[in-house]
Amino acid sequence: MLPISYDAQTGYIQYYTPTEELTRGDLSEFPTDAQLEQTVRERLQKFEPELADTSRIVFSSATYETNVSSKTVDVTPEVNGRMVYGKYHISISFDRDGNVTALTQQYAPLKMGGTRTVRLADAKNVQARLDAHDFSANIAQELTDCTITGFEQAYYMNAGFNAEGDYALYPIYVLRGQGTAADGSVQGFEVLVSALAG
C-alpha cells in the first residue's frame, strides 16, 4: 500500500511511492505520451465515465532526458469547454513499466455560489502584465529563442481557501510556446496571465 499525505489547509490528498524506491532511467525508456493518455482515458472510462470525455490530459514537461524517476500526467476538468488551471486537477505519475507511482488529488470540495459577468483584459492589459512579470509559468530552466505558438482562454482556480472558506474560478489567458534549453533541446512551456480587465 502506498503512503498517503494530507494537506489540512487545502484538502489535497496524495498517495505516493517514496522517491528512494523509484528506479531512474532515460525518458526514452518510459511509455510514450500516447500510451499513457490511452491508459488514463481507459481508466477514466471504467471508473469515472462522466469525466472521460470532458477531461483534458496534459503531460508535465520533463526537464531532463536522463535520470528521470517518473512521468506525470495531469487530468484537468473543463468548465464550459475551457480548461481549468490551478489546483483543480488530478496528477498521476508513472514509472518506466507504466505502473502508477503517485496519485495526487489536487482539489477540495467546491462550495457553489453565485456567478458574475466580468470584462476580459485586452491585448494592452496583457502586454502590461507580461512586462511587469505579473504571470506564472512552468519554465523549469532558462530558455532562449522563445516563441509563442498558441493561445487559449481558460480558467484558474485559487490554490488556497479564500476568506469564506471556498474557492473561486477566474478567467485567464494561456500562452503556449517553446524555447531552446542549454543542452540544445526544445522545451515547451505555458504562461498563465490574468484575463480580468483592469
Residue ranges and their predicted role:
Residues M1-D53, V58, P77-G81:
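Preferential activation on post-signal-peptide N-terminal prodomains/segments
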Residues M1-Q9, A52-D97, E152-G188:
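Exposed beta-strand-loop-beta-strand "reactive/processing" segments of non-cytosolic proteins
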Residues Q9, Q14, Q35-Q38, Q45, ...:
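Residue-identity detector for glutamine
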Residues Y15-F30, I92, R96-L120, G188-G198:
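A short, surface-exposed interaction/processing loop segment used at functional sites
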Residues Q45, T63-T66, T147:
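N-terminal start-of-chain detector that recognizes signal peptides
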Residues E48-P49, S55-I57, G86-Y170:
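Charged, low-complexity helical/coil segments in non-catalytic cytosolic or luminal regions
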